[in-house]
């Protein structure tokens, strides 16, 4: 990269103790010297790498702020380029002024994710490691963070590279045998080839088996709270969120649109969606909310169906139970503080599902509710033992393509297909796996991936 880029690496929408303006590229230190006036009257070009210096940031001779400046010289930096980081006071205005000074001194404003993109293009990290950076930033729970850190450390890359190496070794042998059949006996090596492909297929399949837990770890459990009007759905949301997120009244139809809240349950994220109470209504707005609730239930990982246990089941209840009969459902018998009319036995006569009795008003039964959710998803213990989880849809699809190609190779071996045709499917698997770590990537795909990053990263 010939140009030098700069951006604010901390928040641009709120003030803080400090802000960081990052500069990376061949002229980073030169630009740093243009804007930095050291208290010791030293030049950044003359200092050792990975050192910190105190002084003022200036723009055309006008002092903007006191700052600490960190100098990091290539190649031992995040981007493998010269980097200068300016730690200034964390006000929004002063930080923008410092960035303006750097841009006026010759830097170009970085695109979103461009620092990490340069780390990838300069070979410090591969593409899956680069994607792990944004996953670390967006991690919602401890498990997602740990998985992302493992990916950044290269544990996924190592598994992918091991599979690719086995594939490539077999392609090389087949091609050598085709060129020199007198010295390389393909027929004698068929069993070894089949064994290698089966091992590769097994390794790819083991990665794919982590996808479901990986998605839950990364995105959380899509949880829709469903029920009739005034069953206590919004009260339950407030109790689980431990704050007054939803308006609660005795008036039916108070909740007309969805309300979302994220909670952490023993290290796993539940994405709770409170929905409009399901009933027949002539109100246009409420009707839209009811239809939206039904559609959300169709795509939910978990439906929490809240029943007013102080009332008998009616047609609206039966409609809801028909809607969710094929889903993973937890029925909450709410209003245990009142005389119970509908019981767990009544529900289980109609649906095969878990039930918990609570009082959202008195906040009783909530611990049992949380334990039941854990049992439904994690057999009572939230525990992830693998060091690598597939959390990216992109990785999942590429692994599936590679797996399909490897299956075609096995079919070809069993049907005694010509070896040169086997190499076509082997190379297809090799290339799709390479796309995961960026070995075979095209510029437009790389640009799409890095455009999802925040500015300054």
Regions found by a protein language model. Give the residues of each.
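C-terminal-of-GTPase-core extension/linker across diverse P-loop GTPases
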Residues: 3-9, 142-264, 281-283, 313-457
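A glycine-rich (often HGG/GG-containing) alpha/beta subdomain
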Residues: 1-146, 150, 154, 330
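Switch I (G2) and immediately adjacent beta-strands of P-loop GTPase domains
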Residues: 53-65, 69-73, 253-281, 299-302
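Conserved catalytic network of the ASCE P-loop NTPase/AAA+ motor domain
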Residues: 13, 62, 76, 217, ...
């Amino acid at each position: 990269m010939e140009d030098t880029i700069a951006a604010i690496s901390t928040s641009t929408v709120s003030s803080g103790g400090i802000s960081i303006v990052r500069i990376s590229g061949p002229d980073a230190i030169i630009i740093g010297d243009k804007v930095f006036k050291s208290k010791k009257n030293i030049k950044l070009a003359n200092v050792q790498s990975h050192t910190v210096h105190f002084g003022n940031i200036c723009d055309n001779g006008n002092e903007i702020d006191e700052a600490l400046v960190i100098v990091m010289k290539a190649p031992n930096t995040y981007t493998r380029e010269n980097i200068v980081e300016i730690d200034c006071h964390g006000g929004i205005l002063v930080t923008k002024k410092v960035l303006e000074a750097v841009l006026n001194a010759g830097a170009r404003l970085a695109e979103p994710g461009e620092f990490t993109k340069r780390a990838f293009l300069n070979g410090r990290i591969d593409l899956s490691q680069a994607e792990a950076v944004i996953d670390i930033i967006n991690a919602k729970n401890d498990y997602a963070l740990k998985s992302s850190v493992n990916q950044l450390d290269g544990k996924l890359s190592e598994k992918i590279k091991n599979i690719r190496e086995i594939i490539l070794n077999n392609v090389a042998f087949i091609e050598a045998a085709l060129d020199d059949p007198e010295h390389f006996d393909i027929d004698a090596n068929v069993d070894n080839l089949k064994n290698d492909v089966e091992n590769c297929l097994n390794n790819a399949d083991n990665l794919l088996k982590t996808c479901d837990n990986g998605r839950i770890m990364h995105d959380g459990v899509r949880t829709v709270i469903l029920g009739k009007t005034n069953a206590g759905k919004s009260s339950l949301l407030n109790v689980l969120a431990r704050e007054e997120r939803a308006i609660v009244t005795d008036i039916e139809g108070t909740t007309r649109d969805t309300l979302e809240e994220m909670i952490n349950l023993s290290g796993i994220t539940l994405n709770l969606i409170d929905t409009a109470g399901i009933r027949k209504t002539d109100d246009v707005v409420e009707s839209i909310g009811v239809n939206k609730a039904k559609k959300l239930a169709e795509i939910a990982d978990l439906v929490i169906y809240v029943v007013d246990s102080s009332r008998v089941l009616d047609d609206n209840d039966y409609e809801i139970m028909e809607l969710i009969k094929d889903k993973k459902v937890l029925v909450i018998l709410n209003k245990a503080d009142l005389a119970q009319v509908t019981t767990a036995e009544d529900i289980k006569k109609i649906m095969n599902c878990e039930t918990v009795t609570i009082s959202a008003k008195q906040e009783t039964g909530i611990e049992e509710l949380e334990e039941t959710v854990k049992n439904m998803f994690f057999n009572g213990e939230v525990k992830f033992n693998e060091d690598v989880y597939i959390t990216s849809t992109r990785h999942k699809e590429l692994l599936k393509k590679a797996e399909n190609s490897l299956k075609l190779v096995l079919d070809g071996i069993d049907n005694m297909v010509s070896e040169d045709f086997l190499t076509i499917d082997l190379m297809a698997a090799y290339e799709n796996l390479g796309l995961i770590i960026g070995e075979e990537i095209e510029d437009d795909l790389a640009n799409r991936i890095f455009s999802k990053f925040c500015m300054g990263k």
